[in-house]
Amino acid sequence: MLASCGAKGRFDQVDDGKIKLASSLTGKRDVILQEVLNKYNSRKAKDDYPIEITKIAGSYDGGRSDLQTRLSVKDKTTFYNMILNYSDTISTLGRSNMELPLDSVDVSQFSENFLSFNDRISGISRKGIYGIPVSMSTDILVINGPVLHYILNSAKKKDGAVTKKNASNSNGNEGTLTVNNDQQTTELWKKIEEAAKTNGKTTQEQTKRDAKQSTSLIQLKEGSANTTEGNASESDKEIKKSWGNYQEVDGGLKGYTFKASVFEN
């Protein structure tokens, strides 16, 4: 994204003879970016401005905050000319009339699919190319182990005889979900169970602390906190208070086979 200057409603930046690129990248990505700019600066035309990195702390959120601050105080001396961030920062520039279209830049090497986000930027009245993709973000999938355990364990078909404890977990519904027995799924299911056990143990310890501080002390059953199965059950019981009873429905987990591969993308 580029910042402009000079027009009505905007402010002029001091011409310091260089292009400042704001970046919040760290680690290897920061090193690679600097190497690319070093190569550009060594090969650029004599009269072209060199590019210099302005480091911003706080990742992309820090970049957004820094941009808003510099615009609000009309920073003319240390403000940057470009920023590596998401497209919503173009809207921020647009509110101060500081957006700059890349009309003279050759973007023919970019797929239109990667540039189409420019048509969906709020606050920008004039259509144009205001930002170009320079890197890929990493998609991260985070699994809440204890919650997933409650859902799957409630939906799971019980092995062998149904004990009173298992019956209470199924909330009156006989589960039909099965866990696939391939190695990857088995290992994942063990991790999910361990997450539930850890959560259950933490919950029981907190319950004990609360009970000691309470005037109406509730006697906990001895030994229940020391069983790993009890810990997982305690976790399920607490999560059930927020999520409610599991209900088996068509199109849901009824007859479903849980596999670790479902999380692959």
Curated annotation (Swiss-Prot):
Pfam families: Lipoprotein_X
InterPro entries, sorted: Mycoplasma_lipoprotein_cen_dom (IPR004984)
Gene3D superfamilies named in the record: Periplasmic binding protein-like II
Protein name according to UniProt: Uncharacterized protein MPN_146
UniProt record similarity statement: Belongs to the MG185/MG260 family.
Region spans: Disordered: 162-183, 196-239
Top-rank taxon: Bacteria
Biased composition (Polar residues): 165-183, 213-233
